[in-house]
């Protein structure tokens, strides 16, 4: 970390801007909004500065820069179009032990100005460390669209309630659950926006006085196939609100880095032929943590209801009366095929898709005759160890040996690897790949050479 993000209290503190043009004006607006006692020094000023001075909002010092202007300052900004002058201001500020920002010259500055999302009292600052201001601006714009304009009013109102909430709810967990209910209550937010005092009071009393459910809950979240950018917005919200995250091997490190920092993390990863934690024990972990009153996220790669055993885990919770919900994820078949340039359906080649597990419970047998039919795409999950059997069975039941096949390893991740060939080569191809891998069989695989976009990135 090259810069420490801090929020400075500048109200009624002396600050200096050197420069009287448009760039200096933008910086001045920020300092004035923060309540700074502002002095602006320049040889000439644009009209806005004169208007501010006439209104008593700042002091103008016309003339060359003099180091004595820094004597009482807490903070300075060099915002002229003269690089040498900006450097002199920076060096003088350094000698005075005053933080100084130099516009468009982060290496000459002792602090940099972030992109700001202002929902006062809630403030969000985004910075690229001065390396890419455009990137910081794009991120700010994206965050602006996610944060409602009335969020500041809700945050300010929450500050007024802190004392009462502390008296009403004895434990930290109870208080956190109350605040989470308040911040997502649309009626309260709208009432604050409309300054409807009656509705504000009614909604607040309802939230404070309704009984808190001391039972925990479990949210089954699909993490998607690997690329953290494919995690859904709702999935992200859930892992950032969790007390406990129970996760498996298919959840990438990039996604785990998004988990709430103080959440407990329980790894229950599985590998082909080896279960780190038996399924029954996983069920009991979810049950045990929820019974402690915790918010538990069961985080699974792909989609939890597609070969994720999510249904089995939820049955245990249902039988115990534990509340639960499900956040779907992008399943591996969809993600891996898209990132490999293989459309699962195509008007000319495939009118249906079969998602098939590569291993069944003891005694299970697939309907190989129907699987060998034309005009469909087959996607085998967890089928790497059974690739030779899949090849044999499909050919025995009439699928042409020249049918295109592909195996996708670590789909959608930067380490994705794809190998393709024909059905007669499937067993041999599988020996060159590692788990997790997905097998795709069908005429659509032949489009890969034309549609493969991800490897070019």
From Swiss-Prot:
Keywords: Cobalamin biosynthesis, Lyase, Methyltransferase, Multifunctional enzyme, NAD, Oxidoreductase, Phosphoprotein, Porphyrin biosynthesis, S-adenosyl-L-methionine, Transferase. Residues 216-457 are annotated as: Uroporphyrinogen-III C-methyltransferase. The active site is at 248 (proton acceptor), 270 (proton donor). GO terms for molecular function: NAD binding; precorrin-2 dehydrogenase activity; sirohydrochlorin ferrochelatase activity; uroporphyrin-III C-methyltransferase activity. InterPro entries: 4pyrrol_Mease, 4pyrrol_Methylase_sf, 4pyrrole_Mease_sub1, 4pyrrole_Mease_sub2, CobA/CysG_C, NAD(P)-bd_dom_sf, Siro_Cobalamin_biosynth, Sirohaem_synt_dimer_dom_sf. It catalyses: uroporphyrinogen III + 2 S-adenosyl-L-methionine = precorrin-2 + 2 S-adenosyl-L-homocysteine + H(+); precorrin-2 + NAD(+) = sirohydrochlorin + NADH + 2 H(+); siroheme + 2 H(+) = sirohydrochlorin + Fe(2+). NAD(+) binds at residues 22-23, 43-44. The keyword NADP does not apply. PROSITE patterns: SUMT_1 (PS00839), SUMT_2 (PS00840). S-adenosyl-L-methionine binds at residues 225, 301-303, 306, 331-332, 382, 411. The keyword RNA-binding does not apply. Residues 1-204 are annotated as: Precorrin-2 dehydrogenase /sirohydrochlorin ferrochelatase. Pathway: Cofactor biosynthesis; adenosylcobalamin biosynthesis; precorrin-2 from uroporphyrinogen III: step 1/1; Cofactor biosynthesis; adenosylcobalamin biosynthesis; sirohydrochlorin from precorrin-2: step 1/1; Porphyrin-containing compound metabolism; siroheme biosynthesis; precorrin-2 from uroporphyrinogen III: step 1/1; Porphyrin-containing compound metabolism; siroheme biosynthesis; siroheme from sirohydrochlorin: step 1/1. Its EC number is 2.1.1.107, 1.3.1.76, 4.99.1.4. GO terms for biological process: cobalamin biosynthetic process; methylation; siroheme biosynthetic process. The modification Phosphoserine is found at residue 128. Pfam families: CysG_dimeriser, NAD_binding_7, Sirohm_synth_M, TP_methylase. In the N-terminal section; belongs to the precorrin-2 dehydrogenase / sirohydrochlorin ferrochelatase family. Then it catalyzes the NAD-dependent ring dehydrogenation of precorrin-2 to yield sirohydrochlorin. Finally, it catalyzes the ferrochelation of sirohydrochlorin to yield siroheme. PANTHER family: SIROHEME SYNTHASE (PTHR45790:SF1), SIROHEME SYNTHASE-RELATED (PTHR45790). This is Siroheme synthase. The lineage of its organism: Bacteria, Pseudomonadati, Pseudomonadota, Gammaproteobacteria, Enterobacterales. The gene is cysG.
């Amino acid at each position: 970390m090259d810069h420490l993000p801090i929020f400075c209290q500048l109200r009624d503190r002396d600050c200096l801007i050197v420069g009287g043009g448009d760039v200096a004006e933008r910086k001045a607006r920020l300092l004035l909004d923060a309540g700074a006692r502002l002095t602006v020094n320049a040889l000439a000023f644009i009209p806005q500065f004169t208007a501010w001075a006439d209104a008593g909002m700042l002091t103008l010092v016309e003339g060359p820069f003099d180091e004595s202007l820094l004597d009482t300052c807490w903070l300075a900004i060099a915002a002229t179009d003269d690089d040498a002058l900006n450097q002199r201001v920076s060096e003088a500020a350094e000698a005075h032990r005053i933080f100084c920002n130099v516009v468009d010259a982060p290496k000459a500055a002792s602090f940099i100005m972030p992109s700001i999302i202002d929902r006062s009292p809630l403030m969000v600052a985004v910075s690229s460390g001065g390396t890419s201001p455009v990137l910081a601006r794009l991120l700010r714009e994206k965050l602006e669209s996610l944060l409602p304009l009335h969020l500041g009013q809700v945050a300010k109102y929450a500050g007024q309630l802190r004392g009462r909430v502390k008296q009403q709810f004895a434990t930290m967990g109870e208080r956190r659950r109350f605040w989470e209910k308040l911040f997502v209550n649309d009626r309260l937010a709208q009432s604050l926006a409309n300054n409807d005092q009656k509705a504000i009071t009614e909604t607040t009393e309802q939230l404070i006085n309704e009984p808190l459910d001391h039972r925990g809950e479990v949210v089954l979240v699909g993490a998607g196939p690997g690329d953290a950018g494919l995690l859904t917005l709702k999935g992200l919200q859930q892992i950032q609100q969790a007390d406990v995250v129970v996760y498996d091997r298919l959840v990438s490190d990039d996604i785990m880095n998004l988990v709430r920092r103080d959440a407990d993390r329980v790894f229950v990863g599985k590998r082909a032929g080896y279960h780190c934690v038996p399924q029954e024990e996983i069920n009991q972990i979810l049950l045990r943590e929820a019974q402690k009153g915790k918010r538990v996220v069961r985080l699974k790669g792909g989609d939890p209801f597609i070969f994720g055993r999510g249904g089995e885990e939820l049955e245990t919770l249902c039988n115990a009366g534990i509340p639960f919900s499900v956040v779907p994820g992008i399943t591996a078949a969809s993600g891996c095929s898209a990132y490999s340039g293989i459309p699962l359906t195509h008007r000319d080649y495939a009118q249906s898709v079969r998602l098939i597990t590569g291993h069944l419970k003891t005694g299970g047998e697939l309907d190989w005759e129907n699987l060998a039919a034309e005009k469909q795409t087959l996607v085998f999950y967890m089928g790497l160890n059974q690739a030779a059997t899949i090849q044999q069975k499909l050919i025995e039941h009439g699928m042409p040996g020249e049918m295109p096949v592909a195996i996708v390893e670590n789909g959608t991740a930067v380490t994705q690897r794809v190998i393709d060939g024909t059905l007669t080569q499937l067993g041999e191809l599988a020996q060159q790949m590692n788990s997790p891998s997905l097998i795709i069989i069908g005429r659509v695989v032949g489009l890969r050479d034309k549609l493969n976009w991800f490897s070019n990135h």
